[in-house]
Amino acid sequence: WEQVARQPTSAPDVFASAESLAYVMFTSGSTGQPKAVAIAHRGITRLVMSGRFIHFGPEEVFLQLAPISFDASTLEVWGALLHGARLVLFPPRQPTLEELGAVLVRHRVTTLWLTAALFEQMALHQPQALASVRQVLAGGDALPAQRVREHLSRLA
């Protein structure tokens, strides 16, 4: 704590514009070869401040499950923090369905990004763990409509 106490209490004197580089991610793209993609601050802001596809707010509880090197983590982290929501960090490993379910229940997670396959497995084997989840986002494949209907009927 001594080292922390010696740090400045004011914000760093750094200017970053909307076009400034926020981070670089690597994607395999369509060729399978790693390709660097530069992400500007504007892209993050547009993603998490538009609110056109998801509700952001201080009452939400986001689970940060995606690897930090994956673009979905941008939504999880900044979507929560820039709106005063709570962000629950899952250890950096693949959870079992039971472990994931326990975290969802313990922290009353309301917003969740999962692969379609993982959502389907949770809906089949841990449906009670999804009781507080009001927003499910997925990428890579379409969510299975039957599992979505079942989840929505449990929320009603």
Q: Which residues does each predicted region cover?
A:
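Motif- and composition-driven signal specific to adenylation
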Residues: 1-156
